[in-house]
Amino acid sequence: MTGSDVNDPRAKLTPGIYDAGEAAMGIKHLFLLKKPSAFQLGSENPDDPKVQKILAQISNPSEVAKAPKGVQLVIAQLAFANSDLAFQGNHLFQGNFYGLNIFDISNPGKTSLLTSMVCPGGQNDVSVYKNLLFMSVEMANGRLDCGTQGFPPAPPPAKPLEKDEKPAPPPAQKDRFRGVRIFDITDIKNPKQVAAVQTCRGSHTHTLVTD
């Protein structure tokens, strides 16, 4: 086994979000398309009210408050991270913790955004079969209606009725969703949620198996 090679072109690549250095073999970078603004946190300030609002929606506020400010910012950015890709014909489906973007890739060098659908819940991994799109949801800000408002903090658990009895958990939010969403994408520019299958702990990712 050999160690790192300083002459490897990858060893001197410059960092960057959109302008990082590149080194490739057998593949060519054709195009860069940034995420739509709705899928970006839009702040580098951990004390920004928007950042704190997102943190409250996706995590335990009392716990995340103990984390360093830089870590808090990274956690908030995760709520807008891209996840899995799915392909069908000339369409690319990009899952994102905050929803879904659909692209026309008929000409890869001129890839264009067709549809953006805000639907928080993470991880939002996607699979496509015929006219149906399946999306995994596991985070605390997932709602049946794809809303962005999240939920108020859960009330404290009820006091135990008897000695040594565990306190009852707070009631579940009726609009919260964790599981697998199913969308009809017959109209590729207007996906419609046609089913939402709740699971015990939500769905981090999934595998689509057909007959």
Question: Which role does the model predict for each range below?
Answer:
Residues M1-D211:
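Feature marking well-ordered beta-strand scaffolds used for ligand recognition
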